[in-house]
Amino acid sequence: MKILILCDMFPPAFGPRMGYLCKYMRRAGWEPVVVTEQIDDSTFSFLKGETPVTYVNFFHSKGKILQKLEWICVFILDYFFHYKDKKMAKAASRLLEEGEYAGILCSSYRTFPLPAAQYIAEKYHLPLVIDLRDIVEQYASNEYIAHNFRTFSWLDRKITEIFRHKLLRDRNNALRKAEQVTTISPWHVEKLQAYNPNTELVYNGYDPELFYPEQHRTSQFVITYTGRLISLATRDPRLLFEAVSRLDREKLIDPDQFRIQWYVDAGSKAIIMQAATAYPVARYMDF
């Protein structure tokens, strides 16, 4: 049986949750088919596998100025006319017209492409399952917005307030129409059950083929971080850098015996490197 998956990102981009889900679905006899946004990233290229994927590209410009102008245009069109969701729904509809599907799964860290999934589920009378990896309410500030508006501070706050309201309204409308909702922690479950009581917990995990319990002695002490850093508001590595700096200053560690390994995307790396500039820790880090 085929399952159509709509998601905001999918391998080779930074989308391990859906990437691994597709891997296990195929083993269980399901046929996942994915529609996702085209993102220039190859962090999880090894996870794409044999899953058929339709990539929808919203951004075509080259050069920083044109890219910024294009982003503003897409943002305005999407805010007023659901541009991205309509384009995603159109790509998904073409696939649904070609064969039978048992249902639709939509995974998002914010809201997009939930309205698209809600629309095609209603149009084709298919059950909808929504998976939310992150939600707007968990962020300390406006880290869920990919780009700063960079206008006047008071205007930025107003735009952010209006944008947040729209994100939550669209998300909650889709949640109410879903047959099932899954999310990543008990706190998320509690928040989302207010909009859909059929909300269940599915933790993020590790592929047992790559990570499994093992005991062995090594020549290095390694601290490993896997994931993304959107800002320093909720995940601040400077406390770690301060501790490492102190241990280095007291000559209790050296780079041959102590390493910090980061498995992150390019945006996260830039945040980490910027935060590390005030500390003598670069020689301890690997990316």
Language model regions located:
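Conserved nucleotide-sugar donor-binding subdomain of glycosyltransferases
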Residues: 67-113, 157-168
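N-terminal subdomain of nucleotide-sugar transferases
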Residues: 1-58, 180, 247
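Acidic anion/phosphate-binding donor-loop and adjacent secondary structure
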Residues: 193, 206-220
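Carbohydrate-associated surface elements
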Residues: 184-187, 205
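Nucleotide-activated donor-binding/catalytic signature segment of Leloir-type glycosyltransferases, i.e.
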Residues: 252-264, 269-287
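Conserved donor-binding/catalytic core segment of Leloir-type glycosyltransferases
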Residues: 215-237, 241-244
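An aromatic- and histidine-rich active-site surface loop
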Residues: 81-88, 104-124, 130-146
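Membrane-proximal helix-turn-helix segments that form the acceptor-binding/catalytic region
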Residues: 86, 90, 119-123, 136-138, ...
